[in-house]
Amino acid sequence: PWDHIVRVDGRRVPVRLFAPRTNSRDSILLFFHGGGWVTGNIDSYDRVCANLSNITGRMVVSVDYRLAPEHRFPAAPEDCYAVARDIFTDLSLFMMTPRQITLIGDSAGANLAAAVSLMARDRGEFLPESQILIYPATAADHGPNSPFPSVHENGEGYLLTAKHIEEY
């Protein structure tokens, strides 16, 4: 892997690039890590991104977005959007077309992938054609009155409980 800095409006957004062992560079997975918007970084997801690159044969660009509570909303989605905009608007950097770039994330990162897609649509600067949302955080109702049966059936007895999700 190699590290790079995306500079946006006076701030620096670190990214880490992973190339597959096959040396194929015909597409990119733009990865946003999970962690409830408060934990995780490109170091903690290093192995995940390296494996993702090798298994899929794609380049992976992992974004080290700013975390809460030190950085209030919308810091994280703005960082992710800035990196995506850089990649989509300077396609010569990777010699790609928009079709070859997929936004991907897990949990809070999946939420960010969806948010970046919506921001791109609304701002009209670029438009991602594909996203992969791995167990996305898309609803905020995980309390006792949650309408989701899975919260009641699986909200206890696991590492990430319904109560912990509410705390995020």
Predicted regions and their residues:
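Alpha/beta-hydrolase superfamily serine-hydrolase fold, recognizing
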Residues: 2-168
